[in-house]
Amino acid sequence: MNPAPIFQKPGSALILLGHGSTVNPDSSAPTLYHAGEIKRRGCFGEVVCAFWKEEPGFRQVLDMVESTDIYIVPNFISEGYFTQKIIPRELGLHGPVTTLPARPGRPARILKYCEPAGNHSRMTEFLLDRAREAAPGVDPGQAALVIVGHGTSLNENSGLAVNKQAARIRARHQYAEVLGMFIEQTPFVTGWQQHTTAPNVIVVPFFISDGMHSYQDIPVLLGIQAARGAAAGGAEIFRRDPYSIGGRRLYYSSAIGADRLFTDVILDQVLRFDTRRPRLSCAPDAASSLSPGCARR
């Protein structure tokens, strides 16, 4: 990915939206980290987070910012049910640009709905990085790479995102096999032994954060954990690689969204919005200026 332009938006707010969890604190950790890093760089006048399953919730977040120019970036892995249905409904969005009329004590505001972080082209590199980290020294030519997504019957885009990444990596001809598999749609990850033949199998969860799915659900479905364990402290599952199953070695990676370079992906989604809709970024209170504050770290 090319270096992001250096920018500063002191008159604008950034709202970063995550899923969150009522039972696992690790679920919101990446979103909170990236928001904190963006705030530290001084990129926006305001930076706040909101979550579907934690406080503050989606419906509260617009009352948490004073800016009239607001960028909203979903820290989600794909453009699917949450980004197309839930978030627009909860925030009252009507497409990429929504104008909220003035009301007593609050001027009119412009909401700029950016693409989810997971739509960024850098996802392919994050997946490959995770695979290399999980199985250092393993020859990709002797390995199957399995990318695991959630999958859902509610929106086909959830599966499309995984399959798109699998196709991109397959086209590089690095791994002996590259497959997209799922928790809740076919092909189910439970069938990994039938769908792969390589002696080494590397499994990378295509999720923003580590939580119930990567700590518990996927390990049980893979057969590397007998039953669902405790919600917290599940990172131990990644430290036991490789697992020996059916005469083959299975390597299991953590999710990709905790990568610190993910912060730059979030900023890139704001820049992409401005590039595609430049006239919306020319208002005096929303002007961008060159600044070293938002340079990549």
What is the predicted role of each segment?
Residues 1-297:
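Active-site-proximal alpha-helix that buttresses catalytic centers in soluble enzyme cores
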